[in-house]
């Protein structure tokens, strides 16, 4: 590797540490040496993101790292070195008044609620989260807005430094993976910490039980720093309790949102779904604690209630939410989580659920949304379509089985690629997997779905004769499976082609210039297109991967890419 390339990698490591697939363990194993901070070259936003993408670890090297596990503590030591290369010390982070949040599901929504609540007090907020949905600059937000393309281009290798230079009053920092050895855990003195709902995810890195995962999440606890969590299963909650005692961290269990609402009007949430109430309850406690520890007035009047004990954990105080808190909860926006886009006859339901528990919550939300929908006035049928992909070490068969009760008429699978060739869009590039891997994975998803569909003996609404093999220009990756099964599933080579088939030109915003050649080569695609074209309403659930949801949003909401 040339000195210039090594130089650039060192300078960008801090900003890229939480990007897809890259870990400080990888960088530490490569032994990058220290270099002075380089002068920023003149470049456009996409050029900056492409340069940042050079730090994504390729799939082959990731496999090597999995086989040769090193000491995870070296990741944090390496992270401190990379921070120093950017011109900062760990002590500089102490001045950011950080709220540090981890969890398996809901941590992003909790952070969004918390940031919006405190911004409603007139405080200047910073927000670091991952992954991004459409553009990488979404990961750094000042006062709720993603950093501009111009500023990202200027500061893209010093993103933490960017927070320091804007002199924010506080920073809400979302953990990337786990907690104990996550790159964000170089934070030494947060004001308060939070743990959202726990579940099974990233098992190759965090462990294969919820208890092992809870130990990792509890790694963000700090001596003397208050921490809050929501009600968890007894096993992982006991692990969090023991971890807190070991570190001398005061850990509290959040009361329910109903307890905070008692005696006042209901709290309106900007995010849909019953599961968001747990995230909102945690966010209120984090904001309340931060305001108290910063001696900020207006933290909310405590209610007359005796503190309780549950599972040997003290309950956090019950207080009356202030008008600022109510405003913050109501105004919270968090794209790609229980999000609904209504476009003519099409309604897109977007939720980046990717764990069993979060998919269960997604299914409840989707079914409730359908129950409360307005009936279409047209004479055609109502059609339900699933657009799904899953990545990493997640069990797609288990996730797809949870989605069966939604009674989809059609299941569509595609990789997290917006276009067949996404080289022109650096924000959507992912070098941590190969193209062959993602296409094979989609075919496996289809096979799992067909097997589940056959088990359920669902009526075949999309029957078609056995197809002839598609031509070389076909956009469908696989013909019908040779064995007898439901014909209600298709695989497309990218998100754009999947959306074109699902929408049939009926989405007023998503209007590709011309349908790609071969879109209807497959007999099932041809027969299904007629049904979709005549449907009075089409309900599309997009789930399984935040990256899939991000790619869909990029195409359905072009303004997000501006």
Q: What label would you give each PLM region?
A:
Residues 545:
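Active-site-proximal loop/hinge segments that shape catalytic or ion-binding/gating pockets
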Residues 3-5, 9-31, 165-175, 190-320:
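Acidic, Mg2+-coordinating active-site environments of NTP-dependent enzymes
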């Amino acid at each position: 590797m040339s000195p210039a390339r090594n130089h650039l990698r060192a300078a960008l490591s801090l900003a890229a540490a939480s990007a897809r697939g890259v870990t400080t363990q990888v960088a530490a194993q490569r032994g990058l040496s220290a270099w002075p901070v380089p002068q920023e070259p003149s470049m456009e936003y996409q050029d900056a993101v492409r340069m940042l993408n050079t730090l994504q670890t390729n799939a082959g090297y990731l496999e090597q790292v999995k086989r040769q596990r090193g000491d995870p503590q070296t990741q944090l030591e390496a992270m401190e070195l990379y921070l120093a290369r950017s011109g900062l010390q760990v002590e500089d982070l102490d001045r950011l008044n950080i709220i540090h949040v981890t969890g398996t599901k809901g941590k992003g929504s909790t952070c969004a609620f918390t940031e919006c609540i405190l911004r409603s007090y007139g405080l200047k907020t910073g927000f670091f989260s991952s992954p991004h949905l459409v553009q990488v600059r979404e990961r750094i937000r000042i006062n709720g807005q993603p950093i501009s393309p111009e500023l990202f281009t200027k500061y893209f290798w010093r993103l933490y430094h960017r927070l320091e230079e804007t002199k924010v009053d506080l920073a809400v920092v979302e953990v990337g993976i786990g907690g104990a050895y996550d790159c964000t855990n170089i934070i030494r003195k947060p004001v308060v910490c939070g743990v959202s709902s726990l579940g099974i995810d990233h098992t190759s890195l965090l462990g294969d039980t919820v208890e092992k995962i809870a130990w990792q999440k509890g790694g963000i606890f700090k001596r003397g720093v208050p921490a809050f969590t929501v009600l968890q299963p007894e096993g992982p909650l006991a692990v969090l309790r023991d971890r807190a005692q070991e570190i001398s961290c005061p850990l509290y269990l959040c009361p329910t949102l109903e307890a905070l609402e008692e005696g006042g009007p209901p709290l309106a949430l900007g995010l849909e779904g019953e599961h968001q109430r747990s995230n909102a309850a945690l966010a209120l406690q984090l904001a309340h604690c931060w305001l108290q520890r910063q001696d900020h007035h207006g933290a909310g009047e405590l209610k007359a209630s005796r503190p309780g004990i549950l599972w040997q954990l003290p309950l956090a105080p019950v207080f009356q939410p202030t008008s600022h808190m109510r405003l913050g909860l109501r105004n919270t926006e968090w794209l790609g989580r229980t999000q609904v886009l209504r476009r003519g006859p099409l309604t897109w339901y977007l939720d980046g659920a990717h764990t069993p528990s979060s998919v269960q919550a997604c299914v409840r939300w989707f079914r409730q949304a359908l129950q409360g929908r307005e009936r279409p006035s047209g004479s055609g049928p109502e059609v339900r379509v699933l657009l799904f992909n899953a990545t990493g070490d997640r069990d797609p068969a288990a996730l797809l089985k949870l989605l069966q009760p939604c009674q989809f008429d059609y299941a569509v699978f595609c990789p997290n690629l917006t276009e067949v060739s996404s080289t022109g869009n650096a924000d959507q590039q992912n070098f941590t997997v190969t193209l062959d891997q993602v296409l094979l994975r989609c075919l496996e998803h289809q096979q799992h779905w067909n097997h589940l569909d056959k088990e359920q003996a669902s009526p075949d609404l999309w029957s078609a004769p056995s197809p002839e093999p598609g031509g070389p220009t076909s956009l469908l990756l696989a013909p019908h499976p040779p064995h007898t099964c439901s014909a209600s599933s298709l695989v497309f080579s990218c998100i754009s082609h999947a959306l074109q088939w699902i929408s049939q030109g009926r989405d007023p915003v998503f209007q590709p210039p011309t349908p790609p050649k071969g879109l209807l080569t497959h007999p099932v695609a041809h027969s299904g297109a007629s049904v979709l074209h005549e449907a009075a309403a089409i309900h599309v659930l997009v789930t399984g991967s935040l990256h899939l949801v991000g790619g869909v949003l990029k195409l359905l909401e072009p303004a997000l890419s501006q």
